[in-house]
Amino acid sequence: MMKVLQLGKFYPIKGGVEKVMEIFTEGLAERGFPSDMLCVSRNGNTENVILSEHARVLRTQKLAEIAATMISPQLIWRLRCIRRKYDIIHVHHPDPMAAVALFFSGYKGKVVLHWHSDILKQKFLLRFFKPLQSWLIRRADLIFGTTPVYVEESPFLKDVQHKTSFLPIGVDPYPWLSDEIKDIRAQYPGKKIIFSMGRLVSYKGYEYLISAMTHLPEEYVLLIGSDGPLKEQLQQQIEELGLKERVTLLGGLKEEKKQAYFGACDVFCLSSVMKTEAYAIVLVEAMSLGRPVIATKIPESGVSWVNAHEVSGLNVPVRDPEALAEAIHKICGDPELWKHYSQGARQRYDDTFTKDEMINNLIETYTQLLNNN
């Protein structure tokens, strides 16, 4: 029986990469393939987490955190101890600590490298990591991107296109939480609700989405889920623009509450400005509930591929509040157009982004890789 290890990032889950690792681990286990995650613990708890009969999260101790990388010598030791148990190690990049652990592990089996994003922000540290990153690219038997755009455009993958492929990230459809959705809508009677979800960090471009509200009629409200280092700065912007009654930072949301906000909104908006936003699972989550999507055309990113322009919604230029406002009003102000994009969003989800389809493709790829010995 094939056994796979997902290697990288952190636990408990905070970002999209960790979420993908968990979806892979649970999805494989549901099909009867034992699968584990090996991660650095965020909170100091190193007890194993049992996800299901065939799926576990193995956690190691964090020594320090440098430039969003968890330093964990224990990760190296742990991987060396367990490496022979796995037919495939699926490494999730960017995570320098995972690359270091694999380098020193002595693992001889198949390696799949999942290229979620180039390293963009920590360019100084990239100088030191680049030789190891190059080794990781050479060591990989197969390299996955999340979209064809990112695989083709990444400067680091130009010379290895022969062993690259792409695997769109799929999720289970969100449930329609009627009572919770009704409660949220009741808080904003007669309003059109714009929802956005993601950490309050610079690459999300929330300042442009907030500014877009000054170009929209009073009937529009903007709700932004999650927390982050820019919370105070964004709250100050909201107050300076006189938008306290129309823009709300919701803070962190539990899963069910988050699902309810997706269902309650009229349109989901992603205002990201950098290719750090390589995919945006939140777009897929919104589409699963038939929410029209407005996203940005980030150069070299896969975001505008995920949100098919004039199918599941509209894509607009980055850093352009007026373009965001125009797209929002165009969809929300025309019931027939809203219905068109709502149906298109759900159809795109069904055709491309279901979890079942993703896991089927993943198992098929793993099997082919092992058969190519």
PLM regions with names:
Residues 288, 292-297:
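Short hydrophobic beta-strand element within catalytic cores of glycosyltransferases
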Residues 39, 133-179:
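Donor nucleotide-sugar binding/catalytic pocket of nucleotide-sugar-dependent glycosyltransferases
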Residues 246, 323, 330, 337-352, ...:
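A short, well-ordered alpha-helix in the C-terminal region of glycosyltransferases
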Residues 308-321, 329-336:
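Conserved acidic donor-binding segment of nucleotide-sugar-dependent glycosyltransferases
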Residues 91-98:
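Short His-centered aromatic/hydrophobic patch
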Residues 5, 183-213, 223:
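Conserved donor-binding/catalytic core segment of Leloir-type glycosyltransferases
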Residues 263-278, 291:
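Acidic donor-binding loop of glycosyltransferase active sites
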Residues 233-253:
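Nucleotide-activated donor-binding/catalytic signature segment of Leloir-type glycosyltransferases, i.e.
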